[in-house]
Every structure is written in C-alpha cells, then in structure tokens.
C-alpha cells in the first residue's frame, strides 16, 4: 500500500506549509533541501512532495497526492475538482486590477487585460458587464502596460510595492487569497479519521 501523500507548493508558502505538517504531528526522516522533491515520515507512513503550486491541485484531483497545501488563487483559477477542506492562516495576498499611474479612465469597454489568472479575471469583469480581451502571461505581468501589450493587468499583490516600482496603481481587488488545505474526494473518505485529528491540531 502506498503511503498517504501530501503535496506542498514550492516557494513562499513552503516553509509555513511544512510547519503546518509539524503541527499535525508529521516528522520527516530527512529535511528538504534544494534538490530533494520528496521526503517521508516512515513512522506514520506519509510521503510529502514539494512541487510547483500550479501542479498541486492536479496531483490531488488525479489521486497522485491525497492532500495538498496551496494558495486559494490557484485552486479557484483552475476550478480544480478537489475538496476545499479548510483555510490556513498564512499566504495572504490579493489578485488586483492595476493600471498605469498616468491612466485617467483605465477601466472601460473593450480593454486588453494581461494576467496569469484568465478565469478569475474574466469572471470579475463579466460580473461588471465589461468586455475585455485577455492576454495570458506566465510572468512579469507588470511590464505589459509599459510595452503596449495590455491596457491594464490583474496580478497578485501582497504589499503593492512591485506595482509602484513599475509605475502602476491599484484599482480594485478581484480575489482575496490565503493558503488552503485541499483533499482528493476518495482520499478524504479513506483517511477521514486522520484528517479529523489534523483539523483539531
């Protein structure tokens, strides 16, 4: 029987996600380092994976991992068929609309919006009755208005410092996010007793 597997998002969430597992009573035989992508708690027969945040919901939905810790922004953007078990008190950020500081009327009909989050962005503007053209990017979203690629952007924001440094102003909040503990639907039934103890940790 394969071990209970938990996928953690690499990057900013990872240290606090590991600390959360520690609160659950999970103790890894060997610590993670820059090359180690998986680690084991042999006492409890648990495997922990360190993978890209956008892959965590995929692993959990497909059953390659039983549970995962990832940002709500990723889960809601992907509309992943996973259980949203409970939010965790870290990884706070917002998906925001931002435009060049010099823009007088930035949100208008038929604007071009650059984003890494097309689903959440489309949904936000649809609810406002504004037609947009989406440009899907994978990084350096802040450069899009300056290069003429887009009129405005939606991007993750924690302090707003990066927006200001790139000559952008925050206009509206699209989505508030934090870390989320997610589960595979079948695994939740299989490991319900275990999950219940984690919820109380």
Locate predicted features:
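Domain-level signature for soluble enzymes in the chorismate/prephenate branch of the shikimate pathway
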Residues: 1-201
């Amino acid at each position: 029987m394969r071990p209970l597997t938990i996928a953690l998002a690499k990057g900013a969430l990872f240290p606090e996600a590991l600390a959360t597992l520690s609160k659950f009573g999970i103790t890894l035989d060997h610590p993670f380092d820059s090359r180690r992508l998986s680690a084991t708690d042999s006492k409890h027969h648990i495997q922990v994976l360190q993978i890209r945040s956008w892959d965590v919901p995929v692993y959990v939905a497909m059953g390659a991992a039983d549970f995962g810790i990832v940002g709500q922004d990723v889960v809601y953007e992907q509309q992943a068929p996973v259980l949203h078990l409970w939010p965790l008190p870290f990884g706070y950020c917002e998906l925001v609309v931002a435009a060049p500081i010099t823009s007088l009327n930035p949100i208008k009909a038929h604007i071009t919006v650059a984003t890494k989050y097309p689903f959440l962005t489309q949904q936000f503007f649809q609810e406002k009755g504004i037609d947009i053209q989406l440009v899907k990017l994978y990084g350096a979203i802040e450069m899009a208005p300056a290069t003429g690629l887009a009129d405005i952007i939606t991007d993750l924001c924690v302090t707003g410092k990066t927006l200001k440094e790139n000559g952008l102003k925050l206009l509206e909040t699209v989505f508030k996010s934090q870390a989320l503990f997610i589960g595979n639907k079948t695994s939740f039934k299989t490991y319900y007793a275990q999950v219940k103890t984690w919820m109380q940790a």
